[in-house]
């Protein structure tokens, strides 16, 4: 945590708020997630964070879209609390016995460490070029700002004044949902959402491929082989897709390849 504060400076607190809310949401939604991932050693621990965001975020979106509630921080907190309460109730009354992977808590610990470190490193890297410039970044940021100002969905189109969005905005919406839920600012969470996705793109493939290798190899496989396979999967999804400039801009240039 000390290293995170040193790397991120004033952005550290927003980063920690997001990381903590993700941890809490994942914990609360384990009764549901464990039922889906009951064949996994970690009971889908890291997937629980994503499932929580999807369920709570979709709940807020649908109720706002049909004009039952306004899209505010208060409504986001209330609906998230109700969804979380439903998950806890399911765990208590749904005869779900194996909710937490007590026998594999070391695995859960290391998955959390991996998620935190990758999330931190991507956030630190994003700080070198945080501007919403290039490709669709300006539009993404504009959509998010529009939704932050609005209490209805879809929000007013920043390109076509007086009209609502006539474009898919799911990714931007979930970013704003988490922003309103945590009481943070789009100026920071615009990049934080991108780096969070990159962190999930590492740890989710890690969990999945590690489990696949363990199931495939059985007792023939050593612990380090399944873990190494999971790490390779995480690197392939989260890192390799961002190597275009390094490969084409640097390596090919050094090798004289055009």
Regions found by a protein language model. Name each.
Residues 12, 16, 20, 106-113, ...:
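Active-site lumenal/periplasmic loops and adjacent helix-entry segments of GT-C-fold
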Residues 1-106:
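Membrane-embedded, hydrophobic transmembrane alpha-helices
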């Amino acid at each position: 945590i000390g290293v995170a504060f040193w790397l991120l400076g004033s952005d550290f607190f927003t980063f920690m708020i997001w990381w903590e809310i993700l941890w809490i949401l994942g914990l609360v939604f384990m009764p549901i997630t464990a039922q889906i991932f009951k064949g996994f050693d970690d009971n889908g621990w890291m997937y629980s964070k994503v499932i929580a965001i999807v369920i709570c975020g979709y709940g807020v979106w649908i109720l706002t879209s049909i004009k039952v509630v306004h899209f505010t921080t208060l409504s986001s907190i209330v609906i998230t609390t109700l969804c979380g309460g439903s998950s806890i109730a399911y765990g208590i009354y749904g005869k779900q016995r194996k909710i937490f992977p007590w026998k594999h808590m070391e695995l859960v610990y290391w998955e959390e460490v991996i998620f935190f470190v990758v999330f931190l490193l991507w956030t630190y890297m994003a700080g070198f070029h945080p501007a919403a410039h290039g490709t669709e970044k300006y539009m993404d940021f504009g959509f998010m700002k529009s939704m932050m100002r609005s209490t209805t969905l879809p929000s007013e189109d920043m390109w076509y004044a007086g009209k609502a969005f006539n474009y898919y905005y799911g990714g931007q919406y979930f970013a704003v949902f988490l922003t309103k839920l945590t009481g943070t600012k789009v100026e920071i969470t615009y990049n934080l959402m991108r780096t969070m996705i990159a962190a999930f793109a590492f740890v989710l493939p890690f969990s999945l491929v590690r489990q696949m290798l363990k199931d495939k190899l059985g007792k023939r496989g050593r612990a380090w082989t399944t873990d190494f396979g999971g790490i390779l999967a995480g690197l392939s999804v989260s890192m390799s897709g961002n190597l275009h400039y390094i490969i084409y801009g640097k390596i090919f240039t050094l090798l004289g390849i055009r």
